[in-house]
Amino acid sequence: MKGHFRTGLRQLTFTEPAHNGPTGDQLGPRTLLTDVRYPLASGHGGPRPARGPLPLIVFGPGFQFCDGSYADLLRTWASAGYVVAAVYFPRSSCLTGAAATESDLVNQPGDISYEITSMLRLSKARHGLFAGLINPRQIAIAGQSDGGDTVAAIAANTCCTDHRVAAVAVLSGAQWPLMSGRFFSRRPVPMLFTQGDADTVNIPGCSANMYRADRAAARYYLDLFGADHTAPYWGTNRFERVVARVTLAFFNRYVLGRAPAESAMRRDGNVPGTAALFSHGGGDVQPGQCIT
C-alpha cells in the first residue's frame, strides 16, 4: 500500500542525557539510533522533505528487532505524509545480540518521549533537513510486541504519560507488569489495539485485557483471524495490508482530525475471513490470560 509521496530515509543518533528512570534507577546516557522515514518533496531528485509542518509517528520495534523488519508498514505511513521516526532501543534492539535484556523495557517509554523531544528540536532549528518539518500538535506513537508494551505505558500508565501524544497504536502488545505506575486509572488518548488470534507470543488476552480496561470513548480492537505474532507487521501479506490501512486511517482520524477516516477504519478493518474491527468497547472481545 503506497500513498501519494515518495519517501526518504535518514539515520540519526540522539543521546538521551543521564537521568533517573521511572523505577528510580540511575540511568547513564542512552544512545538512540533512529531511522527517520519521511515524505519527499515532489519534483526533486534529492533528499528534500515535503513542505511541513507534517505529523510525526514515533515507532518502537519488538524485542531484538529493528525497524527494517517493519519497513513496508513504516513506509506506508511515510508515503501518506507522516514523518516516521523508528528508535533502536539501546538494550533490546537487533544490534544488542546476547546482551539484550527485557528488564530495560521499563526505561523504554522514556526513550520514546526523548525521540519526540529530539525530533521537535530538529524541526525548531532554523536550518537543517528537518527544519520546520513537524507539527508539534500532531504526534502519534506506535509499537509492536515489547514496543507495543512501551507505547501502551505512555498512553495508559501513570508512570510515563506524555501529553504531547494524540493517539497510540499498540500492535500485539501488553501491559508490562514491571511498570511502576498504574494502568488505566485515567482515560487515555485514543488507542488502537491490533492482535492476531493465533499469536502464541503475545496471546490475545493481552490485547483484549487492555481494550476492556480502557474506558475512553475512542478505543478500537482489530482482530486478525489466524495471524501470528509478526505476519501482520512484516512484509506484505493480507494481514499486513489490513493493518497498514487501519492504522493509517486511525492516525488520520485522531492525529489529523479527519472525521471521515473513521468510516475508512471500519471499511478496511472488516474483511471477511481476515479481520474484524471492534470499537468503543463493543464486540466479542473476551478478557483472558496474559503471559508476558
Give the label of every model feature segment.
Residues 1-58, 83:
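Short conserved active-site loop signatures built around small residues
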Residues 69, 101-136, 153:
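Alpha/beta-hydrolase active-site loop
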